[in-house]
Amino acid sequence: MRMTFAIVLSLFAAAALGADVKTGGSKMIPLDGGKYSVWTKQVGPAPAKILTLHGGPGFPHDYLECFEDFLPQKGISFYYYDQLGVGNSDNPDDASLWTIDRYREEVEQVRKGLGLDQFILYGHSWGGMLGIEYALAHQDHLKALIISDMTAGIDAYEAYAQKLLGELSEADRATLKKYEDAGNYEAPEYQEIMMGKVYSAHLVRLDPWPEPALRAFKKFNTKIYNTMQGPNEFVITGNFKEWDRWNDLSRIKVPTLVIAGRLGTMNPDDIKRMGKLIPNSRVVLTSGSHLEMYDAQDEYMREIVRFVKDVEGGRFRADKK
């Protein structure tokens, strides 16, 4: 019976190949010759101008859904994309897949699958790191780049994380250290400090958190996150711990927006430094946190729209260096 059902499904699939079937913008993109597939969705009419790279690693596209209330109304279409192992995409149980290099080339396969060229690449947090990597390897396909809430090296990231943790009380710091030394990052007392005092101050400064962000957390692939980053936003033990692209930023020539929240997890001085090193860039610091698309929403979306419109209209001007 299973074999018969599989044959029927394959016949239906073959018959539908040429059909003009509406999917609400969703499209699965095959990777590695069809071994895996990743989910994408176009929002707004064709042609879409932006491909979005979500954060994490392992944090699905859902938290970016607020873009739908701002970009299409300004005539800007974009693509969601859940990276392999995340959200609506295939989730293979293979830790060897969770590397920067493989994800960088995955983005290139997605670009080809969507038929994109001279497009704007948006990356938030880990997506910003991935955007930098893609730009350094495949810049000829980019029209512009948006790096949101990401610095150019993990050493700088960790240094600022320690500065932010240093603002906690001595008792709270001692409690965190006790559990970190024991490798117990799930202890309720540890989580209470991280979520109640650290994340609430620097990840998203809203109570309650927006529904799309909460939904993304429920779908979070922590296996990928733990492999690549570590146990949380402030303890880096994963395989991108040595990542550093400060010396390579000058190679990014396309118009670039570097944007971050002043109250987030990235050092504002590092964001300004990135702007000085990327020759054709604009730097914006909003009043928000790491998820500034929510807690500094109007500022953030205004700057995203302004950048896209300037690039598309040939009006973009870089900051004076």
Regions found by a protein language model. Give the residues of each.
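Alpha/beta-hydrolase fold catalytic core
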Residues: 13, 17-51, 73-76, 309-321
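Alpha/beta-hydrolase
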Residues: 167-168, 174-254, 273
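Catalytic active-site module of serine/aspartate enzymes centered on a nucleophile-bearing elbow/loop
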Residues: 280-321
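Conserved HGGG/HGGXW glycine-rich cap/lid loop of the alpha/beta-hydrolase fold
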Residues: 36-91
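Conserved loop-alpha-helix segment in the C-terminal half of the alpha/beta-hydrolase fold
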Residues: 246-288
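Conserved hydrolase catalytic core segment
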Residues: 117-160
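Flexible "cap/lid" loop of the alpha/beta hydrolase fold
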Residues: 145-185
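Active-site loop/oxyanion-hole signature of alpha/beta-hydrolase fold enzymes
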Residues: 80-126
